[in-house]
Swiss-Prot record:
The active site is at 204 (proton donor), 335 (proton acceptor). Pfam families: Enolase_C, Enolase_N. It is an enzyme of class 4 (lyase). This is Enolase. The lineage of its organism: Bacteria, Bacillati, Actinomycetota, Actinomycetes, Mycobacteriales. Pathway: Carbohydrate degradation; glycolysis; pyruvate from D-glyceraldehyde 3-phosphate: step 4/5. The keyword Mitochondrion does not apply. Mg(2+) binds at residues 241, 283, 310.
Length: 429
């Protein structure tokens, strides 16, 4: 049996130069694995709590307390447990913390241990991680939702929408989808240069020009797709992450592109975009606690576009269950650090799929070289992954891992393509 023998932890840096937690787990059979924890810039209020140190060190963002929690409490609690019983290990972590939001020991400390244990168990079983988690039938390669133009909290510009993504839905394979996305990315750089706009990068590797607004950004990306010799819609669709909580104020409303709007007015705005651009997905179109607005928006345009819940669900099965009951969104964004353990993440995915919701695996803006989410996307058959632009090594690491997985699967590999958006892709053709 792959019994946990040692647990270690350290403070490392993420892609934004902020500290994060890295955990190492050794099993009694000699197997060793390591996991690093990501961190978000725009975070949902209901996410698992990151334990930060405060004070002057690293501007208060140090994670020595979380590291110490692993060394002093979490590690001793899981040593001796069977690593291939992930649910048992994760339940021990949840029980040890004892809070609903993992605020005592820190979601970052708990998640690091959870993921490192899963990796160690996979290695002990001599299985790739995607196969260990997903079983023998895992074979679907996800559509890369590439954030090639950054705004909102990911860029120092006046663009309110946080992410403008391209989705190569018409590609025959993941390797070709990645090529198409990279070529559009480079074409966009040329388009921006021609327009005299900045080609500086945002947090997730996308360009961060200060453009006039949403439609101006979508027009630039559409030009880039055509410049790359591809067809907007049929070959490469568009997607947005509005991260609307970032421009919502209680008592005021949505302060968006220079005007204050209601949820209904935001819905009208998105509906107008659907008529003008080949959009297949809109994430967080409204604020994280605007349940009634979300339900009305979903009823209005949910049959035309994928509506992804991130901040409103925070990968939490309880919040997702409420969303399903109330008709909120039709897809779940999956971020392992929002809920804090692999088991709870998989429970949320199962609930989403049983409820008829699609799932999109996601990185965070503060990333590391850890590639676990690439394996997770294939393991759960999500058909979609969001892990930034095809640039910056912490983003590209995930794409490169997916290339390896596709190669390892050989003839069994299937690229999700437009089947990842069965109700919506027809709108783009």
């Amino acid at each position: 049996m792959p019994i946990i023998e040692q647990v270690g932890a350290r403070e490392i840096l993420d892609s934004r130069g902020n500290p994060t937690v890295e955990v190492e787990v050794a099993l009694i059979d000699g197997t060793f694995a390591r996991a690093a924890v990501p961190s978000g810039a725009s975070t949902g209020e209901h996410e698992a709590v990151e334990l930060r140190d405060g004070g002057d060190r690293y501007g208060g963002k140090g994670v020595q307390k979380a590291v110490q929690a692993v060394l002093d409490e979490i590690g001793p609690a899981v040593i001796g447990l069977n690593a291939d019983d992930q649910r048992l290990v994760d339940q021990a972590l949840v029980d040890l913390d004892g809070t609903p939001d993992k605020s005592r020991l820190g979601g970052n400390a708990i998640l690091g241990v959870s993921l490192a244990v899963a990796k160690a168990a996979a290695d002990s079983a001599e299985l790739p991680l995607f196969r260990y988690v997903g079983g023998p039938n895992a074979h679907i390669l996800p559509v890369p939702m590439m954030n090639i133009l950054n705004g909102g909290a990911h860029a120092d510009t006046a663009v309110d929408i946080q992410e403008f993504m391209v989705a190569p839905i018409g590609a025959p394979s993941f390797v070709e989808a990645l090529r198409w996305g990279a070529e559009v990315y480079h074409a966009l750089k040329s388009v921006l240069k021609k327009e005299g706009l900045s080609t500086g990068l945002g947090d997730e590797g996308g360009f961060a020009p200060d453009v006039a607004g949403t439609t101006a950004a979508l027009d630039l990306i559409s030009r880039a797709i055509e410049s790359a010799g591809l067809r907007p819609g049929a070959d490469v669709a568009l997607a947005l992450d509005a991260a609307a909580t970032e421009f919502f104020t209680d008592g005021t409303g949505y302060v968006f592109e220079g005007t204050t709007r209601t949820a209904d007015q935001m819905t009208e705005f998105y509906a107008g975009l659907l008529g003008a651009y080949p959009l297949v997905s809109i994430e967080d179109p409204l604020s994280e606690d605007d349940w009634d607005g979300w339900a009305a928006l979903t009823a209005s345009i949910g049959d035309r576009v994928q509506i992804v819940g991130d901040d409103i669900f925070v990968t939490n099965p309880e919040r997702l269950e409420e969303g399903i009951e109330r008709g909120v969104a039709n897809a779940l964004l999956v971020k392992v650090n929002q809920i804090g353990t692999l088991t709870e993440t998989l429970d949320a995915v199962t609930l989403a799929h049983h409820g008829g919701y699609r799932t999109m695996i996601s990185h965070r803006s503060g990333e590391t070289e850890d590639t676990m989410i690439a394996d997770l996307a294939v393991a759960i058959g999500s058909g979609q992954i969001k892990t930034g632009a095809p640039a910056r090594s912490e983003r590209v690491a995930k794409y490169n891992q997916l290339l390896r997985i596709e190669e390892a699967l050989g003839d069994a590999a299937r690229y999700a393509g437009d089947l990842a958006f069965p109700r919506f892709a027809c709108e783009t053709k």
